[in-house]
Amino acid sequence: MTEPNTALLSQKTAQRLHVPLNGQLSLVTRQDQQPLTVIGFLPDTNAVSEQVLAKLIITDIATAQEVLGLSGKLSSIEILLANDVSKTEAAIQSLLPGNALLLSLESQEQSLREMTRAFSINLNALGLLSLLVGMFLIYNTMTFLVMQRRRLIGSLRLLGVTRQQIFTLILSEAFFLALIGTLIGIALGVVLGQGLLQLISGTINAIYFRIDATVLTVTPFQLGKGMLLGMSVTFFAVLPPAFEATRLSPVKVMARSQLESGSRRLIKRVGFISGILIASGLAVAFLSGNSINFGLASIFLILFGFGLLTPVLTLWLMKFIERVFGRFLGVLGRLPVRMVSAEISRTGIAIAALMIAVSATIGMDLMIGSFRQTVAQWLHSSLPADLYLALPGDQMTAEKPLSDQQLKEKIAQLDGVGMVSTALQTKLLAEGELTKTTVFELAEKSKQGFIFKHNMDNSLWDRLEHQPTVIVTEPYAYHHAIRIGQKIDLKTNQGALGFEVIGINADYSGDQGHLIMSRQNYLRYWPDLGYTGIGVYARDGADLKNLESRISQLLTGQQVVKSNQAIYKASMELFEQTFTITEALRWLSAAIAFVGVFSALMALQFERTRQLGILRAIGITSRQLSVLIICETGLMGLVAGLLAIPVGFVVAYVLIFVVYQRSFGWTMAFYFDSGVLFQGIVLAFVAALLAGVLPALKMAQTHPAEALRTE
């Protein structure tokens, strides 16, 4: 490697670039192309090393300086401290020039964790939403298993088996079912995780920092957490049916009517508890400070509360439908309504599971729609220029400021160009943290791109140019509790200096936020690093396509020019990409709810065999019976969809004004979309209808004599 123009890279990277051993790479730099000879391959024997080395070329430092045009310059120095860290750190700090920063590895790791903390919490919340819906499904399944054996349990009680033994028996069965189900769930979760990896890494790349995650890493802690969640949720979900099985006397446990009468009494008590849960959820949402976890917990309390309230509301709706429309429905028309009410111990839970999934879907859709509208309006306002140039390149290069300035002057002199603005993306040390900073040289029209979250002072632009002042973006202000008039200490080449905050600007480009400074102000305290972008404002009537083509001829290397419309389109595509993972997990919750409705209807088929046999015996045809069951399932879906609308509104409101503001520091307007509500009702209705097709066919095929046969 001490020989000039030699390099090492991983074998997989070499294969991707079609470079053999001792072959040559051609590096495109700002000035020209530089050849490098690959003299060896780096070992990438495991997933971690493969990801680290995926896009890495290692050379001798002299080769790197020559190729990049940075002779005699370093971008970083890594120091391993032996002992007395604080004393050594202070000594090193005293030696540093104004443009150098001393950062610990621990602080950088903590910064990366903080950047993705809110994103990670929200992903976990979506996963727990699926778990909540699954909890209703587990309750449904275990209740079905208990009800299926009511006669057996009654017989065992008559033979002397105690309540405690019955309770232990049911819990033991649930334990083994939970163990099998959790193991299968973990295996499927690993497969699903591999599929979602690209979606998640794409979102992180778009919002936070660049990662190249291609291999899923599974730790024992993650497997243990999955096992604990699966077993715990099953345990809590099985307690109500287990207690129900032991509560009744041996004689009463033999009668189905005892179950429904007991369920109705329980539903009334649960209705009161659900009110407490909903009120607690709303209180937690708006009285819990800035905690993201409490904000998410409030949504779960609200959803769980409305889920418990669903059977009560279902009974009221069934009474209303029968009372208002009963005279028009006829006998067969009233039967589905009464069947939903009569089997409320089964139908209520299925409707609740479907309602929770659909309300979460409505809430997420309303939130995403509101966010989309807000971002679209922000993009339209924040892209006032007609054309934008991206000027990538190493800011350490001595020639960059001069070449960027020359390019700016050439563009300004082109026919059709009215004015230009410039931007520099850099990082400054603010309050001890490395902070993104955008340095603007504003044209008059550039000022239209700012959306302030406060009444703007007329002197703001003059102060931004001539005084040590900054504008902060809304996320930065939220996360750092910054208000107008406060000062932020920045490390300059002349030492630490307080910059007054004179504005808070709306920004949705990232959730960490950044500082905004005038170029004139910046050059007083820091060295010139050139530009990272130039905005071009065309004269009225100018041919933008022709102007874009002429500017392209002035560009070199990786410099590009794009219209504001192209940037808007790419930004909105990026926005949609960031919510792909949300969409996938949301549909997973809906699928779980669909399985819940299907299992409830299959359970009803078993329990109502004799009842349906009687209907067949008194003259109802197979076709009428199928229609009857389909009407019942459609009614269940319709009820779930109608109840999901107000719950979805509450979920959307908490997501927009509590969870997302605390997570990302953004504020956005609430946009109502009637199409989302209609889609929610249709989703619930169609899901219930599809779930009822197979049970309806099986029930219709049941022979009356077989259905009425008893022991």
Q: What is the predicted function of each stretch?
A:
Residues 1-711:
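Alpha-helical transmembrane segments of bacterial inner-membrane membrane proteins
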